[in-house]
Amino acid sequence: MSNIEERVKKITVEQLGVSEAEVKIDSSFVDDLGADSLDTVELVMALEEEFDTEIPDEEAEKITTVQAAIDYVTANQ
């Protein structure tokens, strides 16, 4: 597991209040982990802070799964 993957999963657990076992690479934040629109905004903000990056709204809308978050961070480091 990459460092980015570990950090994204940790943020997901903290922001959504789910167990680490529930967070799979292909988990959808909304469909699988029960996030609502406010949760997803807070998740994106936490990712921005953790990885010291700015995620434009049009890109944030595409980050719907754990893998999508990892891919975005990896591509924009």
From Swiss-Prot:
* GO CC annotation, single: membrane
The record's account of how the chain is modified after translation: 4'-phosphopantetheine is transferred from CoA to a specific serine of apo-ACP by AcpS. This modification is essential for activity because fatty acids are bound in thioester linkage to the sulfhydryl of the prosthetic group.
Q: O-(pantetheine 4'-phosphoryl)serine occurs at which residues?
A: 37
Q: What is the annotated localization of this protein?
A: Cytoplasm
Which is an annotated Pfam family here?
PP-binding
Any GO MF annotation of the entry: acyl binding
The residue ranges of the Carrier domain are 2-77
Say where the protein is mainly found: cytoplasm
Q: Please cite one Gene Ontology biological process associated with this protein.
A: lipid A biosynthetic process
Instruction: List the InterPro entries hit by this protein, alphabetically.
Output: ACP, ACP-like_sf, PP-bd_ACP, Ppantetheine_attach_site
SUPFAM superfamilies according to UniProt = ACP-like
Q: In which pathway does it act?
A: Lipid metabolism; fatty acid biosynthesis
The domain of life is Bacteria
What task does this protein carry out?
Answer: Carrier of the growing fatty acid chain in fatty acid biosynthesis.
Q: Which HAMAP family match?
A: Acyl_carrier (MF_01217)
What family does this chain come from, according to its entry?
Belongs to the acyl carrier protein (ACP) family.
Give the protein's recorded name. Answer: Acyl carrier protein
This protein's species is Colwellia psychrerythraea (strain 34H / ATCC BAA-681)
